[in-house]
């Protein structure tokens, strides 16, 4: 579970007009929380605190706590609506979860120890084919990210989905057993030489090479 904690207040004013007033006059983010055995609830957050929380990567893929009128709820972020060009959050959807709920989430992939990779030391270029993977697990087992250790990845090596070391209780949503869905995650290949670098240096004609005048010696 993420260490993120946000405080919210319930609201009774509904509709687009009420949401606009919250955003413009009170600098609040309207939101809704739903799921579990409780009824959906309209709430709002401090916009500044939401912006700060969104700087933390784990809020997009982890279970975190919100406090609504003094009561703690365990939630995941289901949807986030942003202004098309202003740094403003327009609305948030949050889903209540319990520890045993089965979740399907996209989580980020972190590549560690790249500086120790034999392939990189040999001048290879890293190609990150995936930066996140979809997993299935109970809420209590939901990781903030999946690590890929690059310390032993050599030149022309490819790390596939089947090579990922998943935490206990976590599964990929795709079946990689038969290989047809075993997509590459990261690879290292030799740097490509551009065509201009491959062009041969043009030959210099003999007539362009200066010669030394050794004239006849006087007797």
Curated annotation (Swiss-Prot):
One of its GO terms (molecular function) is structural constituent of ribosome. One of its GO terms (biological process) is translation. Residues 209-219 have a biased composition (Polar residues). Pfam families: Ribosomal_L25p, Ribosomal_TL5_C. Residues 194-219 are annotated as: Disordered. One of its GO terms (cellular component) is cytosolic large ribosomal subunit. Keywords: Ribonucleoprotein, Ribosomal protein, RNA-binding, rRNA-binding. SUPFAM superfamilies: Ribosomal protein L25-like. Belongs to the bacterial ribosomal protein bL25 family. CTC subfamily. Part of the 50S ribosomal subunit; part of the 5S rRNA/L5/L18/L25 subcomplex. Contacts the 5S rRNA. Binds to the 5S rRNA independently of L5 and L18. PANTHER family: RIBOSOMAL PROTEIN L25/GLN-TRNA SYNTHETASE, ANTI-CODON-BINDING DOMAIN-CONTAINING PROTEIN (PTHR33284), RIBOSOMAL PROTEIN L25_GLN-TRNA SYNTHETASE, ANTI-CODON-BINDING DOMAIN-CONTAINING PROTEIN (PTHR33284:SF1). This is one of the proteins that binds to the 5S RNA in the ribosome where it forms part of the central protuberance. This is Large ribosomal subunit protein bL25. The lineage of its organism: Bacteria, Pseudomonadati, Pseudomonadota, Gammaproteobacteria, Legionellales.
């Amino acid at each position: 579970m993420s260490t993120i904690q946000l405080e919210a207040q319930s609201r009774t004013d509904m509709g687009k007009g009420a949401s606009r007033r919250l955003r413009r006059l009170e600098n609040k983010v309207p939101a809704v929380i739903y799921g579990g055995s409780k009824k959906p609830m309209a709430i709002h957050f401090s916009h500044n605190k939401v912006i700060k929380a969104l700087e933390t990567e784990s809020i997009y893929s982890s279970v975190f706590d919100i406090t609504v009128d003094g009561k703690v709820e365990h939630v995941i972020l289901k949807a986030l609506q942003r202004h098309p060009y202003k740094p403003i959050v327009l609305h948030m959807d949050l889903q209540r979860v319990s520890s045993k709920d089965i979740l399907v989430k996209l989580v980020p992939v972190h590549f560690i120890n790249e500086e120790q990779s034999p392939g990189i030391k040999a001048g290879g270029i890293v190609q990150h084919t995936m930066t996140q993977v979809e997993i299935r697990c109970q809420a209590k087992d939901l990781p903030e990210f999946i690590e890929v250790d690059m310390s032993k990845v050599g030149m022309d090596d490819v790390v596939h989905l089947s090579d990922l070391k998943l935490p206990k209780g976590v599964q990929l949503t795709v079946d990689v057993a038969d290989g047809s869905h075993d997509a590459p995650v990261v690879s290292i290949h030799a740097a490509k030489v551009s065509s201009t670098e491959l062009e041969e240096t043009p030959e210099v004609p003999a007539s362009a090479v200066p010669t030394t005048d050794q004239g006849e010696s006087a007797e």
